[in-house]
A protein has these predicted regions:
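Cytosolic juxtamembrane helix and N-cap/initiation of the first transmembrane helix
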Residues: 1-31
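Membrane-interface helix-boundary signature
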Residues: 7-18, 57-64, 91-95
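Hydrophobic alpha-helical transmembrane segments of polytopic
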Residues: 17-24, 28, 68, 98-105, ...
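Membrane-helix boundary elements
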Residues: 23-63
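Core segments of alpha-helical transmembrane spans in multipass integral membrane proteins
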Residues: 35, 54-84, 100-104
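Hydrophobic alpha-helical membrane segments
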Residues: 74-78, 91-111, 126-132
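Membrane-helix boundary connector in multi-pass membrane proteins
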Residues: 107-124, 140
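Membrane-water interface at the C-terminal end of transmembrane alpha helices
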Residues: 130-149
Length: 149
């Protein structure tokens, strides 16, 4: 047993990337919440999210965008906890639950965003889904290879 280290130590890039993904959700979520009190950013946020689509009530829309921030930040914290747990004690059950969490969130969130003209969210969701799945899968494969050595 020369190679008794946990497999996640052999794939630090994957683990670091997953942790950064979680951290970016925390930072982004807090940033969204704070923008409610930064009116100079409101036009930029609305233009980024909606482009030229007319908005009936911009103040109400901004409130709902900003109130999502703490939720996104808390997801980042939960993601970090899950990723660290998965890295320390990898199991197929945990892997499946990480993927299930993504599958519950992504299709519904993306569909709602696209149906309301928030196309950038669809692009971001697709990017996060692909990256998160790839990194989790890579971590899982690394763990599986560690078991066979």
């Amino acid at each position: 047993m020369l190679n008794a280290q946990p497999s996640f130590t052999r794939t630090p890039t994957t683990l670091i990337a997953l942790r950064w993904l979680a951290t970016l959700h925390i930072i982004g979520g807090i940033g969204l919440a704070v923008t409610l009190w930064l009116p100079s950013l409101h036009p930029l946020i609305l233009k980024t999210l909606y482009g030229t689509t007319p908005i009936d009530n911009p103040q109400q829309t901004l409130f709902w965008i900003c109130i999502i921030g703490p939720t996104v930040a808390s997801w980042g914290v939960l993601c970090r906890i899950c990723v660290d747990y998965f890295a320390e004690q990898p199991s197929k059950r945990t892997y499946k639950r990480l993927i299930l969490a993504m599958l519950v969130w992504a299709p519904l969130d993306t569909t709602m965003c696209l149906s309301h003209g928030i196309y950038i969210a669809g692009v971001l969701n697709a990017s996060v889904v692909l990256l998160f799945w790839y990194l989790c899968h890579r971590l899982w494969l690394g763990q599986q290879q560690g078991l066979t050595r």
